[in-house]
Structures are given as C-alpha cells and as structure tokens.
C-alpha cells in the first residue's frame, strides 16, 4: 500500500471514521483535523495487505507534541479509519516506528 493513495483519499475527503475510531479520538482529545494532519504528514510503518475486508496499514505521525498511530483500511472506493492511539514506549522503538520483540 502506498501512502500517496491514502493521502489522496484524505485530500478528496473520501474517508470514513469508524465509531470505534471516533471513540478513541474523543478519549484522547484528537480532532478530525489532527487525524487528517497525522495522515497527510505521517508515514506507513506496517502494512497489512491481506487484511479483510480491505488492505490496511499502520501510520505514524505527530499530534500536537506526541507520537500518534492510526490504523487505516484502503477500500475500493474510500479510506476507512479503524483506530487511533498513543503508542506506548515499552511496546515501540525507533521513535515509535518499530515494535519491540
């Protein structure tokens, strides 16, 4: 999956934020603008091409002053935001870009 394809859907405003993602964003005080900026300025750190119903990816970026992750699925006719979260230091390394073993 290419980040450019994901960004294109964001720029076209052709995305859906799932109920779960909305809840997580509310819990973390992450706005839709924050999410859009995270995706437009972020990068893919994990790719899940065999995800169902659509291929998905984990994107890392910055919201405010914090590292933030978003899982998105690139479906045939839209982008779906699955979840958004603050990565935990003990689970990630390399500036929150690689999972610890």
Can you name each region flagged by the protein language model?
Residues 1-101:
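Ribonuclease/tRNase effector modules and their secretory precursors
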């Amino acid at each position: 999956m290419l980040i450019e394809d994901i960004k294109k859907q964001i720029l076209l405003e052709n995305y859906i934020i799932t109920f779960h993602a909305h809840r997580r964003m509310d819990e973390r005080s992450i706005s839709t603008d924050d999410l859009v900026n995270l995706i437009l300025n972020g990068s893919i750190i994990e790719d899940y091409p065999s995800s169902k119903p659509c291929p998905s990816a984990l994107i890392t970026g910055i919201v405010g002053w914090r590292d933030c992750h978003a899982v998105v699925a690139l479906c045939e006719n839209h982008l779906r935001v699955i979840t958004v979260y603050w990565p935990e230091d003990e689970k990630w390394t390399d500036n929150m870009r690689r999972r610890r073993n």
